[in-house]
């Protein structure tokens, strides 16, 4: 599964990107990674035979860490900007797994119905999940809405961004 998303940024007098926090912990690489590719295992026909191009994960470990990391980071970003979850109009999480999406919403205590979800239509489109979900839900987004974006991925790496919708 792969995906691509593009977000067009334009100059504005309004503040759109309020904050972003990106974190990583390399000890998670054994639990979620793609061994092949990059400088260690450059693309080759042998890479295809060895199947090192596929994502490998320990689902239980990833599940637990994704929920905790995404939730903690969302709350951290909100706190350092003097917001609470009640101020958030929309949570836009990485669309990897519906159970993780629901658990993050529960963990940060966001009001039901304020989480944008589209995984049932496309599955996990990797790096495109958040832009695709925002695009699909553009009609719900109103000027001035506060959006909390959050994701978790290989390595482990995770983060959250706080945006003010300016369109």
Please report, for each region that a protein language model flagged, where it lies by residue:
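Short, surface-exposed connector motifs at secondary-structure boundaries
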Residues: 82-87
